[in-house]
Amino acid sequence: MEEIKFNQIGVSFKGSGSYVPDQILTNEEISQKVDTSDEWIKSRTGISERRISRVEDNVADMGYKAALTAIEMANWDIKTIDLIVLATSTPHDLFGSAPSIQSKLGASNAVAFDLTAACSGFLFALITTSQFLKAGNFKRALVVGADQLSSFVDWNDRRSCILFGDGAGALAIEATNEFDNFIGFDMRTDGERGCFLNLPSKNNEDSIIDNIEFLSGGFSPIQMNGQEVYKFAVKEVPIILDKLFKKTNYSSDEVDWLILHQANQRILDSVGDRLKIPREKILSNLEKYGNTSAATIPLMIDEAIRNHSIKQNDIIATSGFGAGLSWGAALIKWG
């Protein structure tokens, strides 16, 4: 593309990190609990195994470990970080896990808060954080995606228990006056279809005193209409990415890598086919980790950087999609 002189605040990508628990749950092991098989799961999802957090672990622990490796890659002084945004739907504390990550890191100068948008969460957090940096309010930021959905799965429901795993990923991003590697984005929500994928509250009626009743808090396991979610993803994700390419004056041919939320291999392949992006440009680690919700995109980015697939100045098209229903896309240049 033609070079345009840059005279605004832009975003630079400085580092990545990830963490997955050491407990591995294979398809064969799941098939001992529910009526399924390794072949059935792999043929329909592409997943062979997933990671499950130990009892003593939580989202803040995983997010901290992922963030620390991103900071090390960026070679930052932790005290220079001034913003931490955690994308999660499963905080260890209902009031938020980002402050715990801030504390564990010792990033005492950073504002820290959670953002909840399910499997779109990391992308929405990355977009939000980039806009804070471009507005000139912050200089260095960590964007973390971490989820522990194993705690909210019905392990007797073969439709959902085969899909989800735990993990965390993080990106270290920085404001710069020299260029802007956050090229563009788009975001969408359709609450009318929210019933296709949700994790609803499960409330029990109780009373404080006579005539004053309340609902005690809790949550039901994940509920999903897999067929509707599949149809939603393979239709909406190519549309939003195509619109983003047009808006940013890029073509799919200029994309080095397509990194989608790792929900289902058939979704990844279908989206790539509709955009005419070759399979070799579609990155996937779904087979090893399953759907880690807000962690999938940064986990995949970090893996691809560390195995030298993603290189400096590579163009990455990425899209998150999931509960809400929500979906979005971003176009970035690594570095």
UniProtKB/Swiss-Prot annotation:
Swiss-Prot/TrEMBL GO biological process terms: fatty acid biosynthetic process
UniProt-annotated stretches for the region ACP-binding: 262-266
Annotated pathway: Lipid metabolism; fatty acid biosynthesis
Domain of life (superkingdom): Bacteria
Cellular component GO terms, alphabetical: cytoplasm
Record keyword RNA-binding present: no
Reaction it catalyzes: malonyl-[ACP] + acetyl-CoA + H(+) = 3-oxobutanoyl-[ACP] + CO2 + CoA
Subcellular location: Cytoplasm
InterPro entries: ACP_syn_III_C, ACP_syn_III_N, FabH, Thiolase-like
The enzyme's E.C. designation: 2.3.1.180
Keyword line: Acyltransferase, Cytoplasm, Fatty acid biosynthesis, Fatty acid metabolism, Lipid biosynthesis, Lipid metabolism, Multifunctional enzyme, Transferase
GO molecular function: 3-oxoacyl-[acyl-carrier-protein] synthase activity; beta-ketoacyl-acyl-carrier-protein synthase III activity
Active site: 119, 261, 291
The protein's enzyme class: transferase
Entry remark concerning the domains of this protein: The last Arg residue of the ACP-binding site is essential for the weak association between ACP/AcpP and FabH.
PANTHER family according to UniProt: 3-OXOACYL-[ACYL-CARRIER-PROTEIN] SYNTHASE (PTHR43091), BETA-KETOACYL-[ACYL-CARRIER-PROTEIN] SYNTHASE III, CHLOROPLASTIC (PTHR43091:SF1)
Family label: Belongs to the thiolase-like superfamily. FabH family.
Summary of the function given for this chain in its UniProt record: Catalyzes the condensation reaction of fatty acid synthesis by the addition to an acyl acceptor of two carbons from malonyl-ACP. Catalyzes the first condensation reaction which initiates fatty acid synthesis and may therefore play a role in governing the total rate of fatty acid production. Possesses both acetoacetyl-ACP synthase and acetyl transacylase activities. Its substrate specificity determines the biosynthesis of branched-chain and/or straight-chain of fatty acids.
Binding partners and assembly: Homodimer.
Protein name as it appears in the record: Beta-ketoacyl-[acyl-carrier-protein] synthase III
Organism: Prochlorococcus marinus (strain MIT 9215)
